[in-house]
Each structure stands twice: as C-alpha cells, then as structure tokens.
Curated annotation (Swiss-Prot):
Domain FAD-binding PCMH-type: 245-434
Location in or out of the cell: Peroxisome
Family: Belongs to the xanthine dehydrogenase family.
Gene Ontology molecular-function annotations: 2 iron, 2 sulfur cluster binding; FAD binding; flavin adenine dinucleotide binding; iron ion binding; molybdopterin cofactor binding; xanthine dehydrogenase activity
Record-given protein name: Xanthine dehydrogenase
Residues where Mo-molybdopterin binds: 790, 821, 935, 1102
Lineage, uppermost ranks: Eukaryota, Metazoa, Ecdysozoa, Arthropoda, Hexapoda
SMART domains: Ald_Xan_dh_C (SM01008), CO_deh_flav_C (SM01092)
UniProt keyword annotation of Metal-binding present: yes
Organism: Calliphora vicina (Blue blowfly)
Length: 1353
C-alpha cells in the first residue's frame, strides 16, 4: 500500500502487454489497460454499454452483474459465471468473454426469454436492479437449462431489489424451473373445480388471479444461445501467457507459473494477490488504498489445482469458493458420511458466504490472508486444524513449508505468520474420522449475503465407549481482532463426558474466556457474548443428536422440546396468490383500465435500454463534479485550502461558499435554513462544503480528497432524540398541539390509566440509483438540468435562485428514476445545485453521480421517532382518552420534518376511535444529515404508536388484542381528531376478510401447539390494520397539470407533472388517457417529465401521483374530445387516425392542457376548520406468521396475507406490485434495517455491507394479496385509490408477530410479558428480549461507565 510505483517491471518469461477479450461477441483490444480500472467502468465509460448499473460499488447489490465465460482450467470446459462488474478488474478479463444485458436481447431485435418473462411477470418497477437480476438468471440458465427453485434461491443471493418485493421476479423465473406449475400453488382455482383464468366468485364479485399469461411466453431453447468465441476456444495460449500491464499508478502481473509468481513476491513483498478482488476492490474504492503492484495468480497450476488424497482434498489457494463448494458436494455424495463431516460443515457455511457473484470469483486463500475477524470460513478452517502449503523463492529455488491454522496463526488484526515474501499456495481439507463431529454456525443481521456478527465452528472427537471428549477445537469469529480458538475451555473438556453437565460448564467458561470490552468495535456487546454460548449450545444439541442417531447415546438423552434448538432456517419454496377484481366482459378490449398491463418501460428496463441520468452519453467538453464533505458533526470551519487539488492536472475549478452570495447560498425546500456550501459552520458529517470539477469521475473524487479543511469542534454533538430532549434542542415554534374532547376528564373517569412509550429507528431509502445530475449550458444564459429528482419544479426554482436568474431560463428534466421513495423529493438539491453552479460558471456540461457511501452520508433518512403516551380505557377495553407526545429526529435542518411530524400526529390513532385526544409534537434538531420524506412520511411511525396502545390495553386487561381492535374500530361517519368525517371507510370489511383468508384463528391454535412443544423455536401471529390519508399536508401542492399533443398521424404525446420513479405512474396515465380518448395504449407515448412541458408541478409524492395527474390528464382529454366531437359525429364509423387527420385539415387544435385542483382540501384548526385534511383514506389489513430462533434472534416470515382497499384498481399488476413492495420495505423498516452511528455522528452503515435490506430469501414463505372488491372510490380518477404508501405499515405485522413469539419464550422462562422491543426488531433485540439461562450469564456494565461504539439516533 505504501510501496512506490517507480520500481522496474520484472524480467519474467516472455510477456504480453495487450488486453484482449470479447464483449457481447465483439473483440476488444486494449494496448494500454489501466490496472485500477474495473470492468464496470470499462463497460460504461469506454464501451458505452450502460445497461450494467453502478448500485453500490462493493459487490453487495448485484445491479452490475454480468456474465463471464472462459475455459475452465480444471475441467477444460466452458464455464459461465455471474460476477459483480463493479469489483472485477478489467485486466482480469484477458482471454474471457463478457456478456452484458445488451448482449442477450433487445427490443429492437428480439427479447431473450429471461428478459421477456421478468418484464411480463411485472418483475421490474424502477428497473435499475433489473439488468443485474436478468444476468444472474441468464448465467444460471447457461449452466442449468432447467434449474430448481433452490438454484434460483442461490443465484439471487447477491441481488437486491428495493421496489418489487421480489415475488413477481420469482414468479416469472419459476417458469424456467423443474417445479413450474400453477403460480397459485395450493390455492389453484382448479382445486375448487373452477376453470383456471375464468374468474372466481368472491362475495358476489368476480375476481381474477392471473397477472400474466404464461402461455404467451417465448419458449426457452438453450441450443440457440450465442457460442463461445472460437478464437478463445481454439487458441491454447490465453492461459499460458504471462501478462504485464503497467498503468499510471499500478502494475498488473499475471504470471503463468509458480516460480514467476514467487519472484514477483520476492521483489515486491507488499504486492497484493488479486483473485476475485472482492476485498482489495472495496479497500481501493472506499478506503482509498493504493496498491502499486497487483498480481493475478489464477493461471498458476499449483494455485488452482485440486487433488483428492487419501486423508484430505487439496485445494489451490486460488480455487473459487463455488468450485470448492461443487467439489465438496460431489465428495459428500461419493464418500462415507463420517468422512465428509468437515466437508459438510464447510458447504453449510459457504452457502451463507456473501452472494453467488462473489463466491464465483473469491478464493479461500484470499479469505484466509485477508484475516477478517468475522470471516465465515476461518473459524471452520481453524476448528479443523487445516494445514496450509506455503512457498517462497529463495536463492534461486522454491522452498515450501507447512503451516497449520492453529491458535497462533493470526498474529494480530489482519496479520498472520505467513511472511511478506511467502505465498499461500494451497490447503488441505481433512477427511473426518468415524467418531469426529464438526459443526458450524453463523449469525448475521440477514441470512443471505451478510457479514457475520458472530460465527463458530466446533470440531470434537468423542470416545464412543466412554462417551468422553478425546480432543476438541472451538473457533469463534467476531469476538476479537482475529478468529480465536477457545483453548482454555477446550482443555477442561478433554476426558469429560459429553452431557448436559459438561455443556453447562463449557458455557460458563466460554463467557469468561471470550469477553468483550463495552466499547468494542461492532457494538452489540451483550448480544455477541450471548451468541458465543448460544452457538456452542446449538453445536452441543446437533452433536448430541448425531450421537443418538448413531446409537452411542440413548434416545432420551435430549428432551423432545429441546431438539429444535439445533435447527437453522431454510428458505421455503414460494407460494403466493394475487386476487383482484375481474374486468367486466362488457368493457371494450382497447379500454385498459382495470387490466394488469405491464409497466410501460419494463421491456426496455429488462434489456438495459432504459436510460437513467448517468447513462446519458458523455459530451465532448463535459466535466465531472465531486463533492467535498464535512468530516465533523458540529464544528466551525477555520480554513479551506484547495491549492493542492487545484494544482493537479485535469482539475478545472473548486467551488465553495465564497463563489456565491450569502443570499444565493441559502436554500431549502420550505425554510431556507440550509446552504449549498457550508460557509462558517458544519452541523453534520456529510454536509457539503465544496466541489471539485475535473476531467473524469475517478479523478475528481481523488482530487476532492486533497482539499484540506481545518475545524474547531463545537459541543455538544447531539445525535439522539433523547440527547435533543436533554438539551431542549428543538426547532422554533415547537412543540405544537392538537386536541379533541377533554383528555383530563377522560383520565379522571377512566377504569384504567396506563403510561407507556415506544421508539423506532430511521431507514435509509436505498434507491438503487443514487442521486445524479447533469447540467448543460444553453443559449441566452439558459441552463438545462437532467436530474434524478421527484420534484423537478423545486430543482428549477432553487437553481434559478442560486444562479440569480428566473425560472423560465431553467429547464429541469427527469426521464425516469431508479427509485425514489421520497428520498429524491427535496434532497436532490444537494447534487443539483452545485452541478448547476459549476455549469453556469464554467459554461461547460457538468455531471455528478454520488457513490453509495456519499449518498447515504449526505441525503438523510426516514425520521426516527420516540412516543410517550398516556391512555385511558374501560375494563371492557374501550379507549376513552389519550395524551401522546411525538418526537422526531429531524437532523440539522428543517427540510420537511414539520410535515412528517404532523402526519405522525394525525395518524397515531390508526383505525381506532379515541373520543378524547391531545397530541403534542416536537421537531428535534440534531447533528445528523437532514432527515426527509420517506414512503409513509410519518404515518407508519404514528401508527406504530397506535398499535402499541392497542396491545398495551389488551395485555393489561388480559384480553385478545383483536377484541380490543373490534371494540375501537372507527365506524363509517366517525370524526377524527382533526375534524374529518370518515366516508367510504371499509376497514372492518378488510379486517374480517383478512381473518378469513389467513385462517387466523386456526393458525393461532396451531402456533400455540407448536410453542408448547418447542423450547428454542417460537412462533407468533399478528394482524395490523392501516388507515392512510391521501393528500399533501399543505393545500397548494394538491394540484397538477398535463399537456397532450396529438400529431397528424394520430400519435399522442402525453406530458404530465408526475415523475416515473418505478411506481408505474406513466403506465397508469397512459391507461387513463387511452380510456378517455378511447384509443389503444399503443397510440400514446410519455417521453419525460419536464418543467417546460408542465409548469409549477408538485412533487411526485404523498401517493397522489395518479390522483392529481390522472385528473389533469382527464381534463385535457375532455377538452380534446369536445373539439373532436363534431368530426366524430360527421363520420361515426371513421378511425382515430382519420378523425385526427380530418381535424388537422380543419385547423382544430390538437393540443390541450389539463389542470386539476383537489377539492375541499386545506384543513387548519384555526383558519379553515371545515376543510378536509385528506381527500380520502386508503385502508388495509395484514396478518403475518413468524418463527424465531430464541438462541440467536434469527427469524423467518412463514406467511403474510394482505387485504387492501384501493378502490377500483387502475392496473392490478402495478397496484399489487406496489402493495408487495411496500410491505417488504415496511418489513425491512421494522426488522432488518438499522442506521448505525458513532457517538460523534459518523455513519457506519454506508452501504449494503453494513446496511441490510430484505433480500430474496426474506419474503414470506406464503405471500397472498387480495384487492378488496366492490369498493369504488368517488374521489379519485376512475374510482381508484392511491396505493404507494398505505401498505407499508402492514410490514409492522411482522414486528408484532415477532413480539408475540418473544412473549411465548418469556412466559416459558417464567418472565413477564411486559417488555420493551424497539424497532427495528433486529436479531440482537430479539435474542436479548427472550432472556434465558444463557443471557443471564452476561453481565451488563453500568450505564454511563463507558462510551458505546454506536448509538441509536
């Protein structure tokens, strides 16, 4: 890392310095490849193949997945693997064939079945993840033409999707599998004797179950796939060539033999061996390491060799993890079971090691030498006492030695006994003995593709006659700077009988041998310590059951209810059903309303042809902007020195607050309390201080780090809500209160009064496309902004403000967004404004797309909330009064926090009538990035408190919480605490339908029986309703415009004020327009959202996109229809094109604007008390069943049933996709997704490595969605209802089901059912809430006696 790059290139065997590979069948020759360049950068920047996306840059999201094909040296066969292009060095591609999403199919030619089925099964919403998912499936099919569902599960371990909820992707790709059948599974309509696809009766309404027609799919013929380039297949020199690529800062070597490899290492001891680049790539990108010498050993025979020996299998250190897995599985099938226990243990651990794209290229040697303390494989290797073959080049010859993976192997954090000039050549996986037992376990936040919190491997030799321990190795990761062996505890086990007494003794000794300091990196101290003993106990149970099975121990050696403690979760095959109202047979075939039409851009998204902001072609004189960010959370800026950066060639300018006036620098979505560039003070880490304009993105980011900033720290640094309360750090004019009735009287007259509290954390938006902007200078001092924003008009307005110009000289365009979820509503300005300023000053196009870590540092999250409440209720359970205090963590500026708080205050009662309410709200000012809009906008946080209240009442009264719900449900015509009458409010219908469809009461009985029979596994079931108000909180935003241009050929160009962010808004608007004009949807096109087409647009937010823009589209259509009416009347049998042609020649205007303002909106308790707060409410109910592992805190969602009232659906496929996607996002909010900050305000969770979204394996095993029928809504376009945000809170059903399961565990342990469980219900919180004899061994340090590693905001 510190080695200079001026060393001479070694004189090796004949070398080759030209990079040759194939991309989509075309030969690429590069005579000067850059060793620091990734394949992704090469594809996008040099070859302009932009279908492959940059989502995270660390191999954690799969958006960059491509397929690599090459001749496998081990088998001499063509091998196809999916890889992460963001980590793959382009220099490693020599002699390979790369296939990108563009290379398998196109809308211009023909779609590949992989692309077609994903699109037509509605598996693409925003589309940014789609190319990566397509390529993961394509690579699987190139290896297995008919895979199993298990193969699909493994193939998608490394892919994330933030929009769909994964179900439609799996449904589409299930059609390729052996298990393919009816998508309805057990709920297939044929079970009831109905003919599939003809609809079913449901309460008098005809319902449909078919979102796509499988029979229309193009058959998959694997024989028609492109051939491997013959040039690569016929020329045998590709693998034997010694390659040397010398770049500006680094040299890449690919030696052809071990001697040359060792010579390089002898000459350059600090040289890095690169196999998969999965560790080094992350270090280079995010830690900014520079490695001048990179060596690729994948063509050295000894490093890739595999040999089966008498007592072991030898693996070269460069053999990929997937190859190791395949070979071990083959050996497990062939060899006696007792010989393969170590192999089985390794295979089990490899399944959860990263994603498949990583395992396809990562090597075990790299994992060992990296020496991560949370490596998944190192504990297995250490417990197995695996031997390594090590070599170095000394005095003209190769010298070998053997090293054992023992307690002394690691000498410190990421250090080991292998010398700098030595190389780990290979390792020996031992075959096990008959009475040797090896098991391993891993606990992470998410099962698939996640780093371990703690992992363990136990290798024990047991004398079958005395049933005593002969020898034992116990290795643990996550408990020290290195993987460690618990040698002291192992010593006391020798010669002891394997029984419960020994287990208890071991557990106590492990607690003593493996302590953790209260401030240890990684946090979760008590949880990690408990995992050590829990994982050993699971190993004890597993090995004991093996001893019972082999007859060494009697059958009654373990109580029956204890057996489940050894189990691990496995992903079940998905079962699902989607039920929606069937379109009437009387409806015209060309009328698309109510039909499951595919997303308008789905086919382009599946082929990589859909263009996102950063996919736009580079302009000749374009510059790239990199932001300079604050490294302090609260400090005064003493000086900014950009001289070193400006002196570097290729740097054109540095911008800071000195380059604009104070007035121009003051910005914000409502209150101008932010700055484009921090001037005198910084209030959070990640605040923008300046920007560097340079020739290319990699260079600009490097030079931005050369800007030196001196600070003076300011105290206090306020991070948490509790700290804000302690320091009374609130925004002005807060708290605010609203009330109805007489709360004090309710408390004085109540049978019961209870005080409680609940808390929930924030949530990162994690749209797959990060914030991006491109600004282009135009004539007459105009500027054009292409921006990934949900609010083009706000970007237009604030750009005009910063440039001191008028809005009519600024055009903001948004073609499509790779996700938004509210995070691109107001925060787009953090990128757009510096880009616009640089463009304006330099008069050159300027581009900026944030890296994932930058985006997460800068843009804010969902608001964390704290609620304190006091409730009054009768002995029967009827709520009579509530006083509640709502605190949200706003971050350093107001942004939209006041509106988020208001919605939480107006949603906390959820679906329940409370006659007397007083609610207060506090906007807490902290030293975090400004938190912002996020799908739900405070509603889910408020309803979270309401559901706690219901369950508190039920617990106190000893009643079923469902009975408390029934007693308190709002009725039709009831008045809320903000004076709104509830009309068309079918919450009870949803409630009872959900109870019936989920078979709730029967399932609960089964769960009770399960819990009685299982000590360490518990299940819970919970149901939650939701009531979500539809409208912007400020009345002026409840408006929309549209523009329709009909051209003389009859084609229609539709423009409206909404932005396509994946939610299908453009698709629905096309459907609305098609019905209104009575034309097929093929006539209509939407190009983009632009401020020069529709002015003064509202943000695409508040779930109001369809409601507002749809009505504006109808208004424009009505105007056109009136103009066309005489022409149609004169020629009633004419066609659309004939009518339009006639209108053109008669000089009838074929262009119309539409406008809509939502009526009756604008509630204000003082100024306008009779107005509505919301236009209407979208309702729904969901029920989920969860199983938890009480020993680890892991959980699995077994089933979810959702019934949603969304009026008359405009498009059932898109609406069900929104319901499922929102549910999964809500599930993540309440269980997996945790923002991790240091006490100093440093965000630790800055990418998918530390921040965990739900993955494919996290969806409910059975996932059923029903759209309520017969519930037309008179207050929105074509009787529909908004759907984007309302279903999200139903994800909370999982949280409360987890809490029910924990309660069962606690009751079995004799503990109170009254306990706190904060959201998200992470594995750590679940485990520590269960409380048992193992957690009781963990001593907690006194509060305030230490500074924790992380805190909860």
């Amino acid at each position: 890392m510190t080695q200079e790059h001026n060393a001479a290139v070694l004189d090796l065997n004949p070398t080759f310095s030209t990079l040759i590979f194939f991309v989509n069948g075309k030969k690429v020759i590069d005579t000067n490849p850059d060793p620091e360049c990734t394949l992704l950068t090469y594809l996008r920047e040099k070859l302009r193949l932009c279908g492959t996306k940059l989502g995270c840059g660390e191999g954690g999201c799969g958006a960059c997945t491509v397929m690599i094909s090459r001749i496998d040296t081990l088998t001499n066969r063509i091998k196809h693997i999916a890889v992460n292009a963001c980590l793959t060095p382009v220099c490693a591609m020599h002699g390979s064939a790369v296939t990108t999403v563009e290379g398998i199919g196109s809308t211009r030619t023909r779609l590949h079945p992989v692309q077609e089925r994903l699109a037509k099964a509605h598996g693409s919403q925003c589309g940014f993840c789609t190319p990566g998912i397509v390529m993961s499936m394509y690579a699987l099919l190139r290896n297995l033409s008919q895979p199993s569902m298990k193969d699909l599960e493994i193939a998608f371990q490394g892919n994330l999707c933030r929009c769909t909820g994964y179900r439609p992707i799996l449904e589409g790709y299930k059609t390729f599998t052996k298990e393919f059948g009816c998508a309805m599974g057990d709920k297939c309509c044929k079970v009831n004797g109905n003919k599939c696809g003809e609809g079913m009766e449901n309460g008098g309404d005809m319902v449909d179950d078919k979102l796509f027609e499988k029979s229309e799919f193009v058959p998959f013929d694997p024989s028609q796939e492109p051939i491997f380039p013959p040039e690569l297949q016929l020329n045998k020199d590709w693998d034997s060539q010694t390659l040397v690529y010398k770049g500006e800062r680094a040299t890449w070597y690919r030696p052809g033999n071990l001697e040359d490899l060792l010579k390089i290492k002898a000459q350059f001891p600090e040289a890095k061996l690169v196999v998969g680049n999965t560790e080094i790539g992350v270090e280079v990108k995010f830690k900014h390491f520079l490695y001048p010498v990179l060596v690729n050993p994948t063509k050295v025979k000894e490093m890739i060799d595999v040999q089966e020996l008498e007592d072991s299998i030898y693996f070269g250190a460069s053999v990929s993890l997937m190859d190791i897995d395949r070979i071990l599985r083959s050996s497990i099938e062939k060899l006696p079971e007792h010989q393969t226990r170590f192999f089985q243990c390794a295979v089990n651990m490899l399944h959860y090691f990263a994603g498949k794209q990583i395992r396809n290229v990562a090597s075990l040697g790299g994992n060992i030498m990296t020496g991560s303390p949370i490596s998944d494989m190192n504990p297995v290797l250490m417990a197995g006492a695996v031997k390594f073959k090590v070599a170095k080049y000394v005095e003209g010859q190769i010298k070998y030695r053997e090293v054992c993976m023992a307690s002394g192997f690691f000498t410190g954090y990421r250090k080991n006994v292998i010398e700098p000039t030595e190389i780990l050549v290979g390792l020996y996986f031992p075959k096990t003995l008959e009475h040797q037992y090896v098991v391993a376990f891993k606990q992470a936040k998410r099962r698939d593709d996640d780093i371990a919190i703690v992992n363990a491997a136990i290798n024990v030799f047991i004398d079958p006659r005395s049933i005593t321990v002969d020898k034992v190795y116990m290795a643990f990761g996550g408990m020290a700077p290195t993987t460690v062996l618990a040698t002291r505890t192992a010593d006391i086990m020798v010669k002891q009988q394997w029984n419960k007494v020994l287990m208890e003794r071991v557990v106590e000794n492990l607690c003593a041998e493996l302590p953790l300091a209260p401030s240890a990196p990684g946090g979760m101290i008590a949880y990690r310590r408990s995992l050590v003993v829990s994982l050993f106990f699971k190993a004890y149970l597993t090995i004991t059951q093996q001893l019972i099975k082999s007859g060494i121990l009697p059958q009654d050696s373990l109580p029956q209810e204890e057996l489940s403690g050894s189990d691990v979760f496995h992903t079940p095959a998905l079962k699902s059903a989607q039920l929606f109202e069937k379109v009437s047979n009387k409806q015209s075939e060309c009328d698309p309303i109510g039909r499951p039409k595919i997303h308008a851009s789905a086919l382009k998204q599946a082929t990589g042809e859909a263009i996102y902001c950063d996919d736009m072609p580079r302009m000749e004189n374009e510059l790239y902007l990199a932001l300079v960010l604050s490294t302090k959370a609260h400090a005064k800026i003493l000086s900014i020195d950009a001289s070193e950066a400006l002196a570097m060639p290729g740097v054109h300018a540095f911008f800071s607050s000195k380059d604009i006036t104070q007035h121009e620098n003051e910005v914000g979505p409502v209150f101008h309390d932010e700055e484009v560039f921090a001037s005198d003070m910084v209030y959070c880490q990640g605040q923008v201080i300046g920007a560097i304009a340079a020739d290319n993105p990699n260079f600009s980011s490097k030079t931005a780090r050369k800007v030196t900033i001196e600070y003076e720290d300011i105290k206090p640094v306020i991070i948490t809500i509790e700290q804000a309360i302690e320091h009374k750090s609130y925004f002005p004019d807060y708290p605010r209160f609203t009330e109805i009735g007489d709360v004090e009287k309710a408390f004085s007259e109540a049978d019961h009064v209870y005080e409680g509290s609940c808390r929930m954390g924030g949530q990162e938006h994690f749209y797959l496309e990060t914030h991006a902007s491109l600004a282009v200078p135009r004539d007459s001092d105009e500027i054009e902004i292409f921006c990934s924003t949900q609010h083009p008009s706000e970007v237009q307005k604030l750009v005009a403000h910063v440039l001191s110009t008028s809005a009519h000289r600024v055009v903001c365009r948004a073609k499509r967004l790779g996700g938004g979820f509210g995070g691109k509503e107001s925060r787009a300005i953090a990128v757009a404004l510096p880009v616009a300023l640089a463009c304006h000053r330099l008069r050159r196009p300027i581009r900026c797309m944030l890296d994932r870590d930058e985006d997460m540092m800068i843009t804010g999250t969902r608001h964390p909330f704290l609620f304190k409440y006091k409730i009054a209720f009768t002995s029967e359970g009827r709520l009579t009064g509530c006083y509640i205090e709502c605190y949200n963590n706003a971050g350093w500026s107001m942004d939209l926090s006041f509106s988020v708080l208001e919605r939480a205050m107006f949603h906390f009662e959820n679906c329940y009538k409370i006659p007397n309410i007083k609610v207060g709200g506090w906007v807490c000012k902290t030293n975090l990035p400004s938190n912002t809009a996020f799908r739900g906008f405070g509603g889910p946080q408020g309803m979270f408190a309401g559901e706690h209240i219901i369950r508190d009442v039920a617990r106190i009264l000893g009643k079923d919480y469902l009975e408390i719900m029934k007693q308190n449900f709002y009725k039709e015509g009831d008045i809320t605490h903000y004076q709104q009458k509830l009309d068309n409010f079918p919450i009870e219908k949803c409630f009872y339908d959900c109870l019936q469809q989920s078979n709730y009461y029967q399932k609960r009985k089964e769960i009770e029986e399960f819990n009685r029979n299982h000590r360490w596994r518990k299940r819970g079931i919970s149901l939650v309703p939701t009531k979500y108000g539809i409208a912007f909180g400020v009345s002026h935003l409840n408006q929309a415009g549209a523009l329709i241009n009909i051209y003389a050929d009859g084609s229609v160009l539709l423009s409206h004020g909404g932005v396509e962010i994946g939610q299908g808004l453009h698709t629905k608007m096309i459907q609305c327009c098609a019905r209104a004009l009575q034309i097929p949807i093929e006539f209509i096109h939407i190009s983009e959202t632009a401020t020069d087409k529709v002015p003064n647009t509202s943000p695409t937010a508040a779930s109001s996109g369809s409601d507002l823009n749809g009505m504006a589209v109808l208004d424009a259509c009505e105007k056109l229809n009136k103009r066309l009416a005489p022409i149609k009347e004169a020629n009633p049998n004419g066609s659309w094109t004939e009518w339009i042609n006639k209108a053109y020649f008669e000089r009838v205007s074929l262009s119309a604007t539409g406008f809509y303002r939502m009526p009756d909106i604008g509630y204000d308790p003082v100024q306008n008390p009779n107005a509505l707060m919301y236009n209407y409410f979208t309702n729904g109910v969901g029920s989920s069943i969860v199983e938890i592992d009480c020993l680890t805190g892991d959980h699995q969602v077994l089933s979810t049933d959702i019934v949603m009232d969304i009026g008359s659906s405009l498009n059932p496929a898109i609406d069900i996709g929104q319901i499922e996607g929102a549910f999964m996002q809500g599930y993540g909010l309440f269980t997996l997704e945790e923002m991790i900050y240091s006490p100093q305000g440093v965000l630790y969770s800055r990418g998918p490595g530390m921040y965990k979204l739900p993955g494919f394996a996290d969806i409910p095993g059975e996932f059923n969605v029903t759209i309520l029928t017969g519930a037309a809504n008179p207050r929105a376009v074509y009787s529909s209802k908004a759907v984007g945000e309302p279903p999200l809170f139903i994800g909370c059903s999982v949280f409360f089901a987890i809490k029910e399961a924990i309660t069962s565990a606690r009751l079995m342990n004799g503990l109170s059912e009254d306990f706190k469980l904060e959201s998200p219900a992470t594995s750590a919180r679940i485990r520590m809430a269960c409380q048992d004899e193992f957690t009781n061994l963990i001593e907690q340090p006194p509060a305030g006696s230490y500074v924790p590693w992380n805190i909860v905001p």
